[in-house]
Amino acid sequence: MALSQFVPFSATELLLASAIFCLVFWVLRGSRPRVPKGLKSPPEPWGWPLLGHVLTLGKNPHLALSRMSQLYGDVLQIRIGSTPVLVLSGLDTIRQALVRQGDDFKGRPDLYSFTFITDGQSMSFSPDSGPVWAARRRLAQNALNTFSIASDPASSSSCYLEEHVSKEAEALISRLQELMAGPGHFDPYNQVVVSVANVIGAMCFGQHFPESSDEMLSLVKNSHEFVESASSGNPVDFFPILRYLPNPALQRFKAFNQRFRRFLQKTVQEHYQDFDKNSVQDITGALFKHSKKGPRASGNLIPQEKIVNLVNDIFGAEFDTIATAISWSLMYLVTKPEIQRKIQKELDAVIGRGRRPRLSDRPQLPYLEAFILETFRHSSFVPFTIPHSTTRDTTLNGFYIPRECCVFINQWQVNHDPQLWGDPSEFRPERFLTAEGTTINKPLSEKIMLFGLGKRRCIGEVLGKWEVFLFLAILLQQLEFSVPPGVKVDLTPIYGLTMKHARCEHFQARLRFSFQ
């Protein structure tokens, strides 16, 4: 029987297909950088032609890449489409790259989705990493510290953050009581995110922030439209054809960024109308003081039109990260009531019921602090940092890494590494306490990865940790959280730039006592 009866293609078609395959193979092979003598490329698992490893990553890239690291080591390479991506796991390897070789790994890849964040001018997402970027980052850091964790001489509170959080936590307690008197239940994230946004809004804009306006509420309650497309491994960043196909998630992402930028731009412009450089009251005012009109900056001055970009980064990152942390904390507390009771016992013993918690109480509340650390570790709700890229040819752990290589930092793997934690799947706050149980095991706490490391480390890390602590301390002093019997709480993370839990609308809060 003739071979042609089994083959549905002509000889010409087979030759043409073979030629195309060889051409694609040659192009992909030729696109790989030459490795200097004596070095080697990172190990790379087998991937599909043209697709690379995108199918392997699936819906939970942090889990897939953690499994790969067990087989191939802390430095491995994958391909998304034809783009090589370096994946780093393991605390020591990540510290080597981001801290000891920080200048080599401080870049950002020029990804398509990043161009829609503050029109591609984001301090956090843009590829810039030179002297101008560094100066603006320092300016933003100083402004943030001055009007958050620095002391406030005009207030009885220890700092601006304590003043704003105390006010918003009290308002949140009142709002939750109203919901319990009405519907009798609530969604914790929807309530917490408004309070957190009001705090960062007050620090950014002072009295100019449109607190709880319809526009602001719409933005903060729909932040998932941002995080679902800004996550590491978004196919639209690696397969250009997807940009021209129907993509509802991408359209929501674009629309959200436009609305968010317009909202902040309007608020910044209104603030500037009565700005007084001799009476700076908030972060935006501090940025105005170090700005100049015109498109170019000189020295430590920045163009006024760029201020909204810095405010966008500060406001956007802080409200989403902190609200997500507090919401995850409440989810753990209702599933583990014994931990909630232990925290409240500590609060009653240290603070009592005659005053509200303050930031200065933090060292005396080690179990609450240990619970927060374990929430950060166990949820790992920031599974990857924003992707990095290499600024020059370099080596890491004996592997050659070319310039402009996209780099994924797997924070989830570090937080669930059995070599670090022993029983990473267990939720156990006690792991962060010293043997006496009275202080935090600081060396162990510093192994948690949530805010990145090195030159791209989150500038709001200290603010975020303080704010989560104070919100939880005030809420748990007065309220006991629960869900009705029979209601299942789903703690499965939903992948994104920040991983949310499934919404739970059946939360309840009981007032433990009232302040007179």
Swiss-Prot record:
<dbReference type="GO" id="GO:0020037">
    <property type="term" value="F:heme binding"/>
</dbReference>
<keyword id="KW-0753">Steroid metabolism</keyword>
<keyword id="KW-0276">Fatty acid metabolism</keyword>
<comment type="function">
    <text>A cytochrome P450 monooxygenase involved in the metabolism of various endogenous substrates, including fatty acids, steroid hormones and vitamins. Mechanistically, uses molecular oxygen inserting one oxygen atom into a substrate, and reducing the second into a water molecule, with two electrons provided by NADPH via cytochrome P450 reductase (NADPH--hemoprotein reductase). Catalyzes the hydroxylation of carbon-hydrogen bonds. Exhibits high catalytic activity for the formation of hydroxyestrogens from estrone (E1) and 17beta-estradiol (E2), namely 2-hydroxy E1 and E2.</text>
</comment>
<keyword id="KW-1207">Sterol metabolism</keyword>
<keyword id="KW-0503">Monooxygenase</keyword>
<dbReference type="GO" id="GO:0042572">
    <property type="term" value="P:retinol metabolic process"/>
</dbReference>
<keyword id="KW-0560">Oxidoreductase</keyword>
<dbReference type="GO" id="GO:0019369">
    <property type="term" value="P:arachidonate metabolic process"/>
</dbReference>
<dbReference type="InterPro" id="IPR001128">
    <property type="entry name" value="Cyt_P450"/>
</dbReference>
<keyword id="KW-0456">Lyase</keyword>
<keyword id="KW-0325">Glycoprotein</keyword>
<feature type="binding site" description="axial binding residue">
    <location>
        <position position="458"/>
    </location>
    <ligand>
        <name>heme</name>
    </ligand>
</feature>
<dbReference type="GO" id="GO:0101020">
    <property type="term" value="F:estrogen 16-alpha-hydroxylase activity"/>
</dbReference>
<dbReference type="GO" id="GO:0042446">
    <property type="term" value="P:hormone biosynthetic process"/>
</dbReference>
<dbReference type="InterPro" id="IPR008066">
    <property type="entry name" value="Cyt_P450_E_grp-I_CYP1"/>
</dbReference>
<keyword id="KW-0472">Membrane</keyword>
<keyword id="KW-0408">Iron</keyword>
<keyword id="KW-0349">Heme</keyword>
<protein>
    <recommendedName>
        <fullName>Cytochrome P450 1A2</fullName>
        <ecNumber>1.14.14.1</ecNumber>
        <ecNumber>4.2.1.152</ecNumber>
    </recommendedName>
</protein>
<comment type="pathway">
    <text>Cofactor metabolism; retinol metabolism.</text>
</comment>
<dbReference type="InterPro" id="IPR002401">
    <property type="entry name" value="Cyt_P450_E_grp-I"/>
</dbReference>
<dbReference type="GO" id="GO:0042448">
    <property type="term" value="P:progesterone metabolic process"/>
</dbReference>
<dbReference type="Pfam" id="PF00067">
    <property type="entry name" value="p450"/>
</dbReference>
<dbReference type="GO" id="GO:0004508">
    <property type="term" value="F:steroid 17-alpha-monooxygenase activity"/>
</dbReference>
<dbReference type="GO" id="GO:0106256">
    <property type="term" value="F:hydroperoxy icosatetraenoate dehydratase activity"/>
</dbReference>
<dbReference type="GO" id="GO:0008203">
    <property type="term" value="P:cholesterol metabolic process"/>
</dbReference>
<dbReference type="GO" id="GO:0005789">
    <property type="term" value="C:endoplasmic reticulum membrane"/>
</dbReference>
<comment type="pathway">
    <text>Steroid metabolism; cholesterol metabolism.</text>
</comment>
<dbReference type="InterPro" id="IPR036396">
    <property type="entry name" value="Cyt_P450_sf"/>
</dbReference>
<keyword id="KW-0479">Metal-binding</keyword>
<dbReference type="InterPro" id="IPR017972">
    <property type="entry name" value="Cyt_P450_CS"/>
</dbReference>
<comment type="subunit">
    <text>Interacts with PGRMC1; the interaction requires PGRMC1 homodimerization.</text>
</comment>
<dbReference type="GO" id="GO:0008210">
    <property type="term" value="P:estrogen metabolic process"/>
</dbReference>
<feature type="binding site">
    <location>
        <position position="226"/>
    </location>
    <ligand>
        <name>substrate</name>
    </ligand>
</feature>
<comment type="similarity">
    <text>Belongs to the cytochrome P450 family.</text>
</comment>
<dbReference type="GO" id="GO:0005506">
    <property type="term" value="F:iron ion binding"/>
</dbReference>
<keyword id="KW-0256">Endoplasmic reticulum</keyword>
<feature type="glycosylation site" description="O-linked (GlcNAc) serine">
    <location>
        <position position="69"/>
    </location>
</feature>
<keyword id="KW-0492">Microsome</keyword>
<dbReference type="GO" id="GO:0101021">
    <property type="term" value="F:estrogen 2-hydroxylase activity"/>
</dbReference>
<keyword id="KW-0443">Lipid metabolism</keyword>
